[in-house]
Amino acid sequence: MRRKEKRLLQAVALALAALVLLPNVGLWALYRERQPDGSPGGLGAAVAPAAVQELHSRQKKTFFLGAEQRLKDWHNKEAIRRDAQRVGYGEQGKPYPMTDAERVDQAYRENGFNIYVSDKISLNRSLPDIRHPNCNSKLYLETLPNTSIIIPFHNEGWSSLLRTVHSVLNRSPPELVAEIVLVDDFSDREHLKKPLEDYMALFPSVRILRTKKREGLIRTRMLGASAATGDVVTFLDSHCEANVNWLPPLLDRIARNRKTIVCPMIDVIDHDDFRYETQAGDAMRGAFDWEMYYKRIPIPPELQKADPSDPFESPVMAGGLFAVDRKWFWELGGYDPGLEIWGGEQYEISFKVWMCGGRMEDIPCSRVGHIYRKYVPYKVPAGVSLARNLKRVAEVWMDEYAEYIYQRRPEYRHLSAGDVVAQKKLRVSLNCKSFKWFMTKIAWDLPKFYPPVEPPAAAWGEIRNVGTGLCTDTKLGTLGSPLRLETCIRGRGEAAWNSMQVFTFTWREDIRPGDPQHTKKFCFDAVSHTSPVTLYDCHSMKGNQLWKYRKDKTLYHPVSGSCMDCSESDHRVFMNTCNPSSLTQQWLFEHTNSTVLENFNKN
């Protein structure tokens, strides 16, 4: 009897072994059939180890979390110690000491950032660990999915592209990186051809794909994702620097819920001197206004965690830096292939994931630096329109809320969005929720900062100085430039009137160029009781941009405790000690709403 039981157990064991091994033999055979020919910069034989690694990882990984799942400290302590000892230009994220000769426009012309400075900084430079201190002690799942890291580029600078790759290789556990896929969007610079292929041949995990024509950022990302082999696809831009232990916190969240899209905190690499620092406000939720400009808003108290280093929900991603389960990405349809070049794709993927059964989080313990260009250095092909992309997203995903966009951008109303039938069918097939659900359940805090229907303005029109008879003017007003006084031009031509001397004292208690329905995105800003009044990005956080229009016609600035003043001789506008009897501190708005002003001044 015992002999029969033993034979029975052996038979069961063999059957179980066959169930485990045979599917993986089939997977290996399928891989061998689909393996592309080796070519310079291509996949070739170098990918075989990654494929074997993927095979083994699929044998041992199921990602059904249970009590047996162990946690691990993924920090590379030795690499962190080495980085701490590095000195030199740009090390520890410090600014490069620029000379006047290095600030010339030629340094920025090809890349939108100072390539001269970039070339003088090490490809392996160290970065400051600016994570919350709690991140140092966080543990993540011992068994994590691996990832294909997709980096699209078009005519990228040599050192900035290579530094992106080096930072990923230096600060990522190698067992978690299935591959790094560089996708060249039809670059024509010589250093991105054979020199790049020769250089990247030194790194077996890196391969290069090339488009046959200019496809744009969106389709180039799609090409990279379609060629990816990892469990997860992680998208980065081509001028980034990954910071310490950036990857495990992202993959951990996906391992726990495969329908979660995760975004690192995006730090700022200065386009001039390459200093590395956090964004203003650091951890904030992604949002948008009703002209479809990306915005960041504070995390509301209801969503704040006891541990500020924990992941938090975000309605909208910033753009090109995120990780997503590869299969889930394709279940969602990837990016809409009808979107051209760049722009609007972050809204499309954000709305789609939330409305169609997934979620999106920002991960404070994962940080990646990004160079925000001084300007876009390349030309967009003729006929390509950001407005068309935004209209396409609005038509497919935003339901009746699209009307709020058209009210602010009436030119969008009759713009063709192309054929959206397939995208609307996809939305139905995925059983996606309504945009009203998104606005009430996910982005419920957005209307507090960017209401679909703007509350009435407190004042608008020209702002005329009583003492000089001159008007505030933005004729020379680029971002960061001082506000000026000029001869008032009301009635001297509608185009000039609309563009230079119309201002709105908004319901946010800031002052912006433009009429109440078409305000611009920069505000009157002052930093001290003697500083000039400058035009700065509106942040809707009051502070330096909070103003009070008092009954004595002064524009009072609570932060500095001073009033807006001016000089007729040099046309300057500046802050000064308040003196209600001074005519140069008295200002007349063309139109005022007394009810709104009274409410402002009560507060």
From Swiss-Prot:
Domain of life, per lineage: Eukaryota
Keywords: Disulfide bond, Glycoprotein, Glycosyltransferase, Golgi apparatus, Lectin, Manganese, Membrane, Metal-binding, Signal-anchor, Transferase, Transmembrane, Transmembrane helix
Cytoplasmic side: 1-11
Compartments in which it is found: Golgi apparatus membrane
Pfam families per the UniProt record, alphabetical: Glycos_transf_2 (PF00535), Ricin_B_lectin (PF00652)
Disulfide bonds: C135-C365, C356-C432, C471-C488, C523-C538, C563-C578
Cofactor: Mn(2+)
GO MF: carbohydrate binding; metal ion binding; polypeptide N-acetylgalactosaminyltransferase activity
Tissue expression: Expressed at higher level than GALNT9. In the developing hindbrain region of 14.5 dpc embryos it accumulates in the rapidly dividing, undifferentiated ventricular zone adjacent to the pons. It also accumulates in the regions immediately rostral and caudal to the dorsal rhombic lips differentiating into the cerebellum. Not expressed in the developing choroid plexus.
Gene3D superfamilies registered for this protein in UniProt: 2.80.10.50, Spore Coat Polysaccharide Biosynthesis Protein SpsA, Chain A
Sites where a glycan is attached: N124, N146, N593
Catalytic activity: L-seryl-[protein] + UDP-N-acetyl-alpha-D-galactosamine = a 3-O-[N-acetyl-alpha-D-galactosaminyl]-L-seryl-[protein] + UDP + H(+); L-threonyl-[protein] + UDP-N-acetyl-alpha-D-galactosamine = a 3-O-[N-acetyl-alpha-D-galactosaminyl]-L-threonyl-[protein] + UDP + H(+)
Domain comment in the entry: There are two conserved domains in the glycosyltransferase region: the N-terminal domain (domain A, also called GT1 motif), which is probably involved in manganese coordination and substrate binding and the C-terminal domain (domain B, also called Gal/GalNAc-T motif), which is probably involved in catalytic reaction and UDP-Gal binding. The ricin B-type lectin domain binds to GalNAc and contributes to the glycopeptide specificity.
Role noted for this protein: Catalyzes the initial reaction in O-linked oligosaccharide biosynthesis, the transfer of an N-acetyl-D-galactosamine residue to a serine or threonine residue on the protein receptor. Has activity toward Muc5Ac and EA2 peptide substrates.
UniProt-recorded name of the protein: Polypeptide N-acetylgalactosaminyltransferase 10
Organism: Mus musculus
